[in-house]
Curated annotation (Swiss-Prot):
Domain of life: Bacteria
The protein's Enzyme Commission number: 7.5.2.6
InterPro entries linked: AAA+_ATPase, ABC1_TM_dom, ABC1_TM_sf, ABC_transporter-like_ATP-bd, ABC_transporter-like_CS, ABC_transpr_lipidA, P-loop_NTPase, Type_1_exporter
Keyword annotations of the record: ATP-binding, Cell inner membrane, Cell membrane, Lipid transport, Membrane, Nucleotide-binding, Translocase, Transmembrane, Transmembrane helix, Transport
Keyword match Aminoacyl-tRNA synthetase: no
Function summary: Involved in lipopolysaccharide (LPS) biosynthesis. Translocates lipid A-core from the inner to the outer leaflet of the inner membrane. Transmembrane domains (TMD) form a pore in the inner membrane and the ATP-binding domain (NBD) is responsible for energy generation.
The ABC transporter domain, residue ranges: 340-576
Enzyme class: translocase
Signal peptide extent: none
Listed name of the protein: ATP-dependent lipid A-core flippase
Disulfide bond in keyword set: no
Native source organism of the sequence: Pseudoalteromonas atlantica (strain T6c / ATCC BAA-1087)
GO molecular function: ABC-type oligopeptide transporter activity; ATP binding; ATP hydrolysis activity; ATPase-coupled lipid transmembrane transporter activity
Length: 585
């Protein structure tokens, strides 16, 4: 995901986000320029006040100024509000749009992408990187226009009053430009490192929060604290590098500006060199030059904000540029019959040499139960991932109702499968909404209740204080493993898909929970094609066909009785689980 785009190209792409806010930008620019020009104009009033009427105080001028100063500063405040509020509004809109784009992209990127990128870093892009973009769109642009307008306004009055003295200040321009160019590259590099460090920090915190029970059980507090401290210190160091670069650049430019000011003062001390300067003109020019130091400092500082924003844009664009899931199918499918077929399927996971599946071929007739048995890592779960097209096979063809999976629209294809896994995913929402997930707007509360009853979930739901409206916490942390599993089954019941995938659905459950869930699964499997991935052979004895897999290849295939009679790999697995005396079960 590494991009090395030039700043100009990144800014052009970023500018696309701003094109919808042309009117707002116009208002903001008017506000910021008006604010700065008032400041510059106030400085220009020093000359007539000091020089007065032939060197005497002009009391009429002072009286007019007294009436004039309040409206001027009211106008200054209005201009400031126009510029600051409008730019803040624009930056918030840009951040919102970028976050929505990232979120949408995350949902449509292939599973392979999420396999290779820590969730903490992806979250950091949504939360932290977009805020850096806001800094570029808001604070940086505000400072650039407002302080830039002030610089031009002050230079205008300086040249108007004494172009000879003002010319000295212009000579520092190339030096300032050179410093800004060098420092910009440093800002960009350090900003990129800060974003990477922030992503690592977020990942570390997320891991500990999710796995805090494991940390407590194994006494890993000191280890994790040390790891986090190291990453936290790295983040601090990167931020300090940015601060150092910022301080050095600001100080360098201010020193150069002070040299120019010193030259002006020295020239002014030579009466024969400049003879037409009045005291008021001299004071106005010197004060304007002194006031230039602050906007020059701000313009140098804003460079760091801008470079942080551009580095964040590169980070965000690197995600947005990833290809989303390929959905090349055109066939619409309402409800499949449920026939599945693998024809000479070979599949490699990315960056792995050994095939997860090799020349895999089998057929599952509609309404039949097909069980997959084998050691961990043999390729059982890979089959279910290929059926739902989380991955695509490199060789061979997978068919649903005699049609290759790639020919169907992805959304229609996945609607044909209901997955119940040992790794249940629930959301921080009500029980009813979790059961109805994916079916919202298409089901009634009565149907949700019926699904819960079929899954034997009502037994515990009715005991909760708010029943179906009970909030269950992140990933159902308020529920037991068996309760979470039953909600997953209820979700599958409500989906009413023609093909059911059960991936270790009853593993690691107590006997009572397993009995209830097994009853619910038997009801769910009726009139559906079922793919059952199991370690517990007792759960698949009634399967129509059992496939024994080893290292991605089919070792044996048949029903429970025939495989036992062959006394092969399946029979050996059965003996390990039940003992020699129960091989006829």
């Amino acid at each position: 995901m590494t991009h090395t785009l030039p700043t100009q190209n990144v800014f052009k792409r970023f500018a696309v986000y701003l094109k919808d806010f042309k009117l707002a930008f116009g208002v903001a620019i008017i506000g910021m320029v008006g604010y700065s020009l008032i400041d510059a104009y106030v400085i220009s009033l020093l000359q007539p006040i000091i020089d007065g009427n032939g060197g005497k105080w002009d009391y009429d001028y002072l009286r007019i100024a007294a009436y004039f100063v309040i409206p001027v500063f009211i106008a200054r405040g209005i201009f400031n509000f126009m510029g600051t509020y409008t730019l803040s509004w624009i930056s918030s809109q840009v951040v919102m749009k970028m976050r929505e784009q990232l979120f949408h992209q995350y949902m449509h990127l292939p599973v392979e992408f999420h396999d290779h990128h820590p969730s903490g870093q992806l979250i950091s892009k949504v939360i932290y990187d977009t805020e850096q973009v806001a800094g570029a769109a808001g604070k940086a642009f505000l400072t650039l226009v407002r302080e830039g307008a002030l610089v031009f306004g002050l230079l205008f009055w300086m040249f108007y009053h004494s172009w000879q003295l003002s010319l000295v200040f212009i000579l520092i321009g190339p030096l300032v430009a050179m410093i800004v160019s060098v420092v910009s590259k440093r800002f960009r590099l350090v900003s990129k490192n800060i974003q990477q460090a922030m992503g690592n920090l977020t990942s570390s915190a997320e891991q500990i929060i999710k796995g805090h029970k494991v940390v407590l059980m194994f006494g890993g507090q000191d280890l994790e604290a040390s790891r986090f401290a190291k990453k936290n210190n790295n983040n601090r160091q990167q931020n300090m590098k940015l601060v150092i670069a910022q301080i050095l650049s600001v100080s360098s430019i201010q020193v150069i500006a002070s040299v120019a000011l010193a030259v002006v003062l020295y020239i002014s001390s030579k009466p024969n060199f400049i003879t037409d300067l009045t005291p008021g003109t001299f004071v106005t020019v010197v004060v304007a030059m002194t006031m230039l130091l602050k906007p020059l400092k701000q313009l140098t500082t804003v460079n760091s904000e801008f470079q942080k924003g551009m580095a964040a844009c590169v980070s965000i664009f690197s995600v947005l540029d990833n290809a989303i899931e390929k959905d090349t199918g055109s066939k619409v499918l309402d409800k499949a019959k449920g026939k599945l077929e693998f024809r000479d399927v070979t599949f490699h996971y990315p960056n792995k040499e050994e095939a997860a599946l090799s020349d895999m071929s089998f057929t599952v007739e509609p309404g039949k139960t097909f069980a997959l048995v084998g050691r961990s890592g043999s390729g059982k779960s890979t089959i279910s991932s290929l059926l739902t097209r989380f991955y695509d096979a490199q060789q061979g063809t997978i068919l649903l109702d005699d049609v290759p999976l790639q020919d169907f629209k992805l959304k229609d294809l996945r609607r044909q499968f209901a997955l119940v896994s040992q790794h249940v995913t629930l959301f921080n929402d009500t029980i009813a909404n979790n059961i109805a997930y994916g079916s919202e707007g298409r089901v009634t509360p009565e149907q949700v209740l019926a699904a819960a009853k079929t899954a034997h979930a009502l037994e515990f739901i009715e005991q909760l204080p708010n029943g179906m409206e009970t909030l269950i916490g992140e990933n159902g942390l308020m529920l037991s493993g068996g309760q979470r599993q039953r909600l997953a089954i209820a979700r599958a019941v409500l989906l009413d898909a023609p093909v059911l995938i059960l991936d270790e659905a009853t593993s690691a459950l107590d006997t009572e929970s397993e009995r209830l869930i097994q009853d619910a699964l038997e009801t769910l499997q009726q009139d559906r094609t079922s793919i059952v991935v199991a370690h517990r052979l007792s759960t698949i004895e009634s399967a129509d066909q059992i496939l024994v897999i080893e290292r991605g290849r089919i070792l044996e295939q048949g029903d429970h009785a025939s495989l036992l009679s062959e006394d092969g790999a399946y029979a050996q697995l059965h003996k390990l689980q039940f003992g020699d005396g129960q091989t006829d079960a």
